[in-house]
């Protein structure tokens, strides 16, 4: 299931469509030339028209979280391949952080700390006078929003260092 054309939310919707009723999720991701060349998706004329063209544009960790929202990246039934060249180390780091932050979210929910964590994150953005990042549009069918709870924050700020290190190892 190869997908890539537009925003992370658009491709996430496509991934969920292609994976519906399948025993496993095979997510083959194509990136746009802006991402592949490591460019900032700026409003410069030579870049703006290429954003999301022939691939998904990923320039932040939040973009990666939105792209794979609703898929448990550490599950043996989820396989991800990415067509990347030059920015491979950066894209791989974003992917690994997305997978770890998903597991931080899972841990906080299992420990009954999720609602308090959401309030803490909300307060953080309010105090900073910033709008919290969000998934643009409605979640596609089959997407439970897993992985979106840490938009705008890193999992290492939400749990004790020992817990975070254990989650990273696992």
Placement of each model-derived feature along the sequence:
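Catalytic alpha/beta active-site cores
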Residues: 1-170
